[in-house]
Regions:
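Terminal membrane/secretory targeting segments in land-plant proteins
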Residues: 1-28, 187
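Folded extracytoplasmic luminal domains of secretory or organellar precursors
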Residues: 26-187
Length: 187
């Protein structure tokens, strides 16, 4: 008797979980998140990021979600620029490289702000602005990629995160455009 009670409880829990998962993926919000995450290189990261951040978790439309995604990337670029600037002042050994990294992150933040302003009127241009930021990330990797100090390691981790967020931002701009001419850039 106890064994069948445990089994029926387990079955009920499994059915409830299945219903919750299917209703979450069928929610109107998920179609906007899917429109962006389908364009991302790391779709699991995309879904996790967009569903766990309040500004992106329950979008009211594709354009507001895309703007929120680009804002998320902008915020990370600005925070990383502050981190780099503060550490350039503290450690003379990394000052020259970090000064250049600071410039790169400031350029990324500016490009993302520009992309967000252009998103509605010209999503192709916004997509270009976001994708051009990848050049700055390559520069940061060139400057600190071989460094093994703790601060450089932290910056490398922040740069990996920035690259992932840039991918989401590019996917967001592309989703707003939705003409799939940029699909070749995602392959």
């Amino acid at each position: 008797m106890a064994k069948s009670s445990v089994l029926s409880t387990f079955a009920a829990a499994a059915i409830t979980l299945q219903l919750l998962l299917s209703s979450a993926s069928a929610s109107p919000h998920m179609k906007y998140i899917d429109a962006i995450c389908d364009r991302a290189h790391d779709q699991a990261f995309c879904v996790k990021t967009l569903t766990s951040n309040p500004p992106t978790a329950a979008p009211i439309g594709l354009l507001p979600l895309a703007e929120a995604v680009i804002n998320l990337a902008t915020s990370h670029a600005e925070k990383t620029a502050i981190f780099v600037d503060e550490n350039a002042k503290k450690d003379p050994a990394v000052k020259a490289a970090f000064t250049e990294c600071h410039k790169a992150y400031m350029a990324v933040a500016a490009a993302l702000k520009s992309a967000n302003m252009k998103l509605k009127a010209s999503p192709d241009t916004a997509n270009y602005d976001v994708r051009a930021s990848s050049d700055h990330m390559r520069r940061v990797n060139e400057l600190v990629g071989k460094n093994s100090d703790k601060t450089s390691t932290t910056l490398k981790e922040m740069t990996v995160q920035m690259e992932k967020l840039l991918d989401l931002a590019a996917g967001a701009a592309d989703a707003v455009d939705d003409d799939d001419e940029n699909i070749r850039l995602r392959v």
